[in-house]
Amino acid sequence: MSVKRNALRVAATTVASGLLAAGALATAGSASAATYPVYGFHTLDNAHDFTFNQLLGINDEGVIAGYFGSGMAVGHPNKGYVLLPPYGQGRYVNENFPGSVQTQVTGLNNRGVTVGFWSDTNKGSGDANFAWVNVGGQFRSADFPTGDDASPVVDQLLGVNDEDLAVGFWTDANGNNHGYSFNALTGQFRSVVDPGDAGLSLSANAINDRGDVAGAYTTAAGTTDGFLLTHRGQFIDLAVPGASSTMALGVNNRDEVVGTYTVGSGGSAQNHGFTWTPQHGFRSLDEPQGQGTTIINGVNDFGQLVGFYVDATGNTDGFLATPQG
C-alpha cells in the first residue's frame, strides 16, 4: 500500500474559474531565494523500521503524522503513528485503524483529529485503500459514496483542517482520481474539482483553516501540475518551470504550499522538494542527504516542514526542517 500523492474550499455552489499561473523558481543565490529562511534538518525514523519512514503532516504543536514499513513486500506492512515533541523513540504513538493489516496516518490538525487510509491486506501490490478519520480516539470510515470504484478500491484522506474538514480523493474504474472533502462533524461529502474543467483527474491533498485546498491534477495536455484552490474559487496552477510534473502536498494558513517536482523521466528522473508562497513563488529545497530524492509533504503555521528522502544506502527516511533565526 503506497501513498497515492501523485495523483478547496469545496464548491457547494458555482465556483469562479479564474486560472492563474504561479511564479518562477528561485534558486540558491538569487534575489528571490534571499527572502526565504535557512532550515535546520533532522532525520526522524521509527526504530521499528529504520529502512522506511515517511512523515506526512505536522501541526502547530509540532506533532507529526507518519508511518513506517514500505508495504511493498509481504511482512513489511505500513504501520501508522504520530510523533510527539520533543522527538525521540519513546515519543512515537502507534495509530492504526482497528482490524487493519496496514495503516497510514497522513494528516492531522491542532485539535488532535487525524486522517489517513487503511488496507485489509499486505500483498505487496494491489492492496485496497479505505479512508478513515479519528476524532477523539473514535475511528470512522470515510469512503466517498460512489458506484464507480476502481478494483481494488483506492480511497484516501490526506489532510484535515481545524474545522475538522478533511480532503482526499478516490479513483474510478478508469483510473481517474476525483477529489473530495469529508466533514468529520456532519458526515457530509462534497466533490472537489477544477472549476475550469471538472472532468480532469484531480486529488485534494491538503486544506487550511480558510478552506484553501492544495493538490494535483492532470492538465488538458496530460501533464501533472499542482494547484491551490482558494476559498474564493480562484484556481492557481502550480507548475515548476522545466519540471516534468509538480505536486502540491501541503498548505498552511499563510497559503505557503509545499510539495515535490520531478525533473527528467525514467531512470534519470529526480524529485526535489519545493515551497511556494503567493508573494515569492517557488523555492527548490532538498534535504541535504537526499539531493534529488526529496518529497516535502507538510507545513505548519511556523513554517516547519516534514517529508522524506532516499539516502545513499537506499533507505527512505523521514525528516523535519525547522526555520532558523
Language model region names:
Residues 2, 6-10, 14, 25, ...:
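Residue-level hotspots at or immediately adjacent to binding/recognition sites across diverse folds
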Residues 19-25:
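Hydrophobic alpha-helical membrane-insertion segments, chiefly the h-region
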